[in-house]
Amino acid sequence: MTEPLTNYLGKPASALLASPPFKFWPFERSVEEDLPERPVDYVFPQHGLELTCDNDEKIHSIFLKSDSFDQALLDIPFSSSRSDVLSLLGVPSKSGGAHTHPILGEYGAWDLFARPGHAIHVGYRADADRIRMVTLMRADVVP
């Protein structure tokens, strides 16, 4: 799942930005000036893709949102159930159940799959048994 995208983890954002189809997608770049490490974010609002980079612009996390990310770039449909994901990716290294945050509202269950050099976090919808978001992270930034 998402193997080509995981290859961008740890590489400069410019590598992804120069590659198809991403080089054709409009994006917004911002720097979080209020934080000491000053991370750089790239948001592709029309395509459900977000990148978070170190201050040297090396990608440490890639967020793929089910409502607008191009399904052709994933090996698993966002319509997959949690059991479908577990069948494909195996036993998760960590999991969490659905919960309600007093301010942010309902969150669905989630699973984290550790891989050599990176991790795959799959968040599920609170209102349906399907994927809400997939996050790819370098191993050194996994919470």
Q: Predicted regions: what is each one?
A:
Residues 62-69, 136-142:
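Short, solvent-exposed aromatic-acidic interface loops
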Residues 58-60:
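Charged interaction scaffolds used for protein-protein
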Residues 4, 8, 63, 72-73:
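Acidic/proline-rich low-complexity IDRs
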Residues 3-4, 8-55, 80-143:
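A cross-family detector of function-defining hotspots
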Residues 68-71, 75-83:
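A low-complexity, Ser/Thr/Gly/Pro-enriched, surface-exposed linker/loop concept
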